[in-house]
A protein has these predicted regions:
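Short amphipathic alpha-helical segments, especially helix-boundary/capping motifs
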Residues: 8-14, 64-68, 112-114, 135, ...
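Conserved Radical SAM active-site core
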Residues: 74-174
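Structural signal for hydrophobic packing residues in well-ordered secondary-structure cores
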Residues: 10, 26, 39-43, 69, ...
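Short, well-ordered coil loops that connect the C-terminus of an alpha-helix to the N-terminus
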Residues: 44-45, 63, 146, 169
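Flexible, acidic/Gly-rich N-terminal and inter-domain linker regions that tether
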Residues: 1-62
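Canonical Radical SAM [4Fe-4S] cluster-binding loop centered on the CxxxCxxC motif
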Residues: 47-86, 110
Length: 177
């Protein structure tokens, strides 16, 4: 697909087949130019943001990525997961300061690495971190004015579909399909 063909998308949407072919373009400069023009045409040059309260549901993770400054090992005399009352207290504080979203961040499936994580999840009534996240994000929708935004790491298509029912947006490292 050449630059002229990409420029065609300024006037029409690509077909599904064409959209797949766009991933093979080597001339990323042209692709970025067309994407920028389409963005500006549709939304102008306004930069917007939404105030978020940061909810680190757990800092434990199955992975050990040496660039990561978020993840850590279990700490003595500390919960591995934020407790429901801690989460709700933080959410209320966010509402008080005008936040619109609750940004949930967490390590990827720590229960697969740490016995302690599995035991804490069981005490919370869950087998998985994603199950606990689902319950907690659901409470945000029901009990606060905030909108849950989930950054939950690697998920299956089923996980994504399930969590979509309790979130306004999701970020993923990658999806396993």
């Amino acid at each position: 697909m050449n630059a002229l063909k990409v420029d065609d998308f300024l006037e029409r949407r690509p077909t599904e087949e064409e959209a797949h072919l766009l991933t093979e373009i080597r001339d990323t400069g042209t692709l970025f130019r067309v994407a920028s023009e389409l963005r500006d045409k549709g939304h102008g040059n306004i930069i917007s943001y939404s105030r978020k309260i940061f909810i680190p549901l757990t800092k434990l993770c199955i992975d050990v990525c040496h660039y990561c400054t978020f993840s850590r090992d279990p700490q003595k005399n500390q919960h591995s997961f934020m407790q429901p009352d801690e989460v709700m207290e933080l959410l209320r504080e966010g509402e008080k300061y005008g936040c619109k979203e609750a940004l949930f961040t967490l390590g990827d499936k720590p229960e697969l690495r740490y016995t302690r994580a599995r035991k804490e999840l069981q005490k919370l009534g869950h087998e998985t971190t994603l199950s606990y996240l689902f319950e907690t994000a659901g409470r945000v929708l029901k009990e606060t004015t905030l909108l849950p935004h989930l950054n939950a790491g690697v998920m299956t298509s089923e996980d994504l579909r399930n969590l979509r029912t309790v979130s306004v947006s999701q970020e993923i490292g990658r999806a396993h399909v």
